Amino acid sequence: MKLLKPSWVNHNGKPIFSVDIHPDGTKFATGGQGQDSGKVVIWNMPPMLKEEDEKNENIPKMLCQMDNHLACVNCVRWSNNGAYLASGGDDKLIMVWKRSGYIGPSTVFGSSSKLANVEQWRCLSILRSHSGDVMDVAWSPHDAWLASCSVDNTVVIWNALKFPEIISTLRGHSGLVKGLTWDPVGKYIASQADDHSIKVWRTMDWQLETSITKPFDECGGTTHVLRLSWSPDGHYLVSAHAMNNSGPTAQIIERDGWKTNMDFVGHRKAVTVVKFNPKIFKKKQKNGSSTKTSCPYCCCAVGSKDRSLSVWLTCLKRPLVVIHELFDKSIMDISWTLNGLGILVCSMDGSVAYLDFSQDELGDPLSEEEKNNIHQSTYGKSLAITTEPQLPNTVIENPEMLKFQQRQQLQQDGEHMVQAQMEAPIHNMASMMNGESLEDIRKNLLKKQVETRTADGRRRITPLCIAQLDTGDFSTAFFNSIPISGSLPGSMMSSQSNQQLISLDSNTTSSSGALKSNVELVGNNTKPAEETANKESGNVSSSSPVAPTSITAQPKIEPMKALDSRFTERSKATSGTAGVAHLNQTAVDRLKEQNVTKDSKPRVVESSSDSEEKIPASKQLSKRKGEADADLAEKRKKGRPRKESQRLMSVSLTVQSQVASTSEKELTCVTTSSLTLRLPTPTPQKSFTLQLSSDPSMYIEVENEVKTVGGNKLSQLKCHREGKEWEAVLTSRIVAAAGSKEVVCVACEKRMLSIFSGSGRRIFPPIILPSPISTLQCTGSYVMALTAAAALSVWDVQNQNIIIKNESLQPLLSGNDLTVSQTLLTKRGIPVLSLSNGKAYCFSPSLSTWSLVSDKQDSLAQCADYRSCMPSQDAVMCSGPLAIIQGRVSNAGRQAAHLFTMPHLVQKETTMAYLENQVAAALMLQSSQEYRHWLLIYAQYLVNEGFEQRLREVCQDLLGPVHRSSDSQWESRILGLWKRELLKELLPLIGQNLRFQRLFTEYQEQLDILRDK
């Protein structure tokens, strides 16, 4: 045996908590404490093995250093195929690293010395689930799973083929879990914790097989780690830190019956780490000795807090070798080379030691074929042989399940082939660019250097940056491995503002397609666009050209796009004035800050046709010429309303108990002593324009009182559609308008609603509304009118019937200071109102009631954690009205789940309730794609958590009756989707868990019977 303690392997005096040798033996990794962070270092193995390589300066010793962990790294482990490195630390994270093929070394960031990263390793995935320090990680024998344990008392099983998917979370320990080891045949995983127990879990169903406590009753939680190990033949599990007659031991646990009759004794302090040699040995046959085959045996290394290392052979009663005082502090980790003749040991004192054995000392190692034969003869064949994330050692009971697995295997093979074909051109392109090698490119770049001469004749070369060239093997960007579904709705909201056409009159300019700001510059003053939007061309107080007015209609677009971040402009278009405005919360807050700007006083304008006064809801309404002097007086008193406003409000038919701030530009609910609701109404403008769709050639123009016939003034409506134009004349001034590709509707002063077809044909006689219009919207062939009396109506113009008739908002606006911040009419005619308290309601015509579909303060959304059930990151994100209503809430809820520590049962219940709410809300909104999206996530969660009863109920509802019956009330479709087609999509999810193979088979067979019929 040879012993070496290389001084060049160190963490600058900081502790090294873990070490692991790469399967190919060319490198090894260490993990521990760095400078203000955790540190993972990959070292070159040849300088450790040969003295001449250590002295050769051309052979690098350090290959790469990664300081991405925010806190100390407790464990590093290579995958069995050597492609990945997993590291876990005190920052509660597990990072999975993969080599990236950069050319040339790079300096270690932040290093004062000239350290260079010869190899480039990038973070492939970051696994977040633990709420405490990660103490140990372990790859399954065939790299299908990655297990991690933590001081949060849990063990998490990750799907190594589909990070960051969680297969299962093992709960049962009542103390800090400090060590993990896999059964070499893949049937069990064992964990050791400070609760004086080792628990063995079945990988078949991730349930507890046995709990071993007796050898650990006298133990205390004095060790930093408890690294236990399973023998390569699978017969023995050896624990760390056990006690026998008050003496520290390493307990030997037999697989057969989990008996604890033997142990490794001799260490003076607690055992911290046990590591079996990966090879199975047999005694070396000497020349002339008996040809009788010897019994195979295993080799085990034991490290302790007494700073000593012992190496044992299971065929001997005493240790093969004991090395005392090998380090200054406790031994933390041990790793064997793949050939079984070398061993690396690390210590808390920040150093490592390498022991090199010979075959004469350990014996002849068995070949891999002989080792597999031992496994097969002892345990039989196992599903663990496959790389599928299935449950090993589970009997497949029927051919349908077997066929399903084979189809999945073929599908994955096809995906890998396509991926390989896509990566091949990348590698070729990286190695050769335009026929030149990368080295030629570098030389050509150096030839292009810029050289100048200074005044004194000296040369000066301008520095030229030569970027690193990646030869491929790209990996996911750092901190970007968790899908954020909430980002898409947010981006859609911000991108929809280009679907607006700005109101025009003779002195205004047009703007369409560009992204508008909420604030426009007028002269030298900065004012909100809405503030200057409604000034008429005849306003004598305006010294600069009138700014474009932000008035648009509700175009016919997808329901999810109907609510966007520029909803203020859209709703003002439907109401005909900036007086009725709907802002998202961000815009509201921005406008609140400008509450003291000029011309921000509330204006109350008396209607010329109705006796009901208008309630102020904007910073400035349309001005008449005679009011210019009054405006100058108002600017001197910025905190008080005009006397005229006070007089008009005092004679209002409803006695106002509260009026919301007019700077908030929201639909304001005014509560009264008689509980009568009043919503703000728009004031007629001289002219305005609104766009019908994203096509800028489709828009309508409104001009009030442009013609005089017999002493009566008429208003004109013009519609421009695909190069064609039609006109309509109305006898009253138009106060609000809305339109889509199918329908154009306008509301006039005399409470009349006129509806026209896309070609200009009047569909109905003027509809008399019960009170003046407050908000008018149109989507497809549906028209929604919200009146000043807080009554909502929705008509189906195509079928000429009413869907919702004068439904009161009283149940929604019963609280104080509640306002309507957003409105939405889906493409199926479902109205949705979003209130200032963050709650959103929709009205169901079938139930004749309001339903809560979203709540920003919902604790379920904040605590639910269903990330492992989300579609992959490259999947098309779900879009629809529910996603737009909730906006970024769902993303915030998933991120907040990491900040809350709660019992698993509580989190499971909250996640279940949240997903069921999402499915029900999508169904209420009649959003078919969102219903399918959330149903699949819900089903995946049921499969992951093992809720068979609810899963069966979902499947039964989708399957329906197998035999036809005249009195059956079952509907074969839901929201236009075939239920049995949805069931076909659910079955592959169910098939992922072999515990549900009978459920899978049951419904698969019934679908086959129905198909044959």
Curated annotation (Swiss-Prot):
GO terms for biological process, alphabetical: chromatin remodeling; DNA-templated transcription; nucleosome assembly; regulation of DNA-templated transcription
Family matches, as PROSITE patterns: WD_REPEATS_1, WD_REPEATS_2, WD_REPEATS_REGION
Residues spanning the membrane: none
InterPro entries in alphabetical order: CAF1B_HIR1_beta-prop (IPR055410), HIR1-like (IPR031120), HIRA-like_C (IPR011494), WD40/YVTN_repeat-like_dom_sf (IPR015943), WD40_repeat_dom_sf (IPR036322), WD40_rpt (IPR001680)
WD repeat start-end pairs: 11-53, 68-107, 129-168, 172-211, 220-263, 266-322, 326-367
Annotated SMART domains: WD40 (SM00320)
A GO MF label: nucleosome binding
Keywords in alphabetical order: Chromatin regulator, Nucleus, Repeat, Repressor, Transcription, Transcription regulation, WD repeat
One Pfam family named in its UniProt record: Beta-prop_CAF1B_HIR1
Role this protein plays: Required for the periodic repression of histone gene transcription during the cell cycle. Required for replication-independent chromatin assembly.
Self-association and partners: Interacts with histone H2A, histone H2B, histone H3 and histone H4.
Identification of the protein by name: Protein HIRA
Gene: hira
